[in-house]
Amino acid sequence: MIERTETPAPASTPSKTWDVAIVGAGYVGVPLAHTFATSGRSVLLVDVVQKVVDGLNRGESHIEDVPSAELAPLVAAGHLAATSDYDALRDADAILIALPTPLSKQREPDLSIIVAATREIAKRLREGQLVVLESTTYPGTTREQLLPILESTGLKAGEDFNLAFSPERVDPGSAWDVKEVPKVVGGITEDCSRRAAELYGSAIGTVHTVSSPEAAELTKLLENIFRSVNIALVNELAQLCDRMGIDVWEVVDAAATKPFGFMSFKPGPGLGGHCIPVDPFYLTWKAREFGFTTEFIELAGKVNEAMPYHCRSLISQALNHKKQKSMSGSQILVLGVAYKPDIEDVRESPALKLIELLRNAGANVAYHDPHVPSIPELGLESVPLDPAQYDCVTIVTDHSSIDYAALVDQSDLVVDLRNATGDKGRDSDKVWKL
């Protein structure tokens, strides 16, 4: 929710020297800017979306994890500002790149956004500046993509300017503040690493330096592939448990009582967000350059990508058995479309794919999400939560603001893909669980 303040917008970006400029005012850039600014650094956010820039300069945050009440005083004091003018980068001591690294339609790395930004930086690069890439990517990106562009200016990394990679570790909607999460840093040279570590160390509690940008790049991929593989394991187990008539949630909870040798992961309708569904493909693509096939990682990706299809089948079974209805013509409410609880981000959300599959099967689909007012690409807006109007309510994202016990009482049929209904759902003949 954007909280509006009365802080006036400056007519233009103040002309000054900035400690840090961050290219990309999104889910990574804004929390990072907030962290540096609250630590006493002067910060400039650079973004091509003028509406975002204007809002930030009024002290209005479009990122839920950084409330406007915290942002506005920093703007008013001149510690933080925003601009769409890349020329302002000339006045920054350090330039951090926090831009998306999506996949192409062919599910291959798309670095076009960060490459374009690096070219803009190169036009303004001066001696003594530090450039750090934060965007998640494959090992070799900093050295193979950014370094040649920046050195085409005639300046040399490690001598005239510094270049490093430090992966973002933002977890939207979580209790983890940016300054509390250790920062991994790997520079082109030791001097590059040292300069980057000094910058991050001024605002973040712990900095861990590795030997190269490649090591830092692979660190981030390992973190997210670890989650992808383990989630795939429990997703596959959930499908087997469905056939065996065993409650997978009960099994996972029981296994989690072991105090060693087990980490609990929960099944669900698929992966979502800007990292976990995307990152494995970055590594598998790069691995092919070395004649290596990451079979285990790719299999996990296939299992997770198949989950919306399994969930569609589960909804169909529930309608057939509980209401003697087919999917075609049924009224279905999807509850929660953000990719994780209590945030507004729908990037790569499995809810979007599930809605598409349900529509293709002839269902009339609506959704309710207290954090996501609309999904323009699907032509949908969030509807009031009135479960009794629908043949089936499907819980896709378990936002904490929903009373799930009341939901069960008011619904004819609930398909619970997140175990949000807990014991009440287990004991109710109206609830089907993943």
Residue ranges and their predicted role:
Residues I2-L434:
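Structural/interface elements that position substrates and couple domains in central-metabolism enzymes
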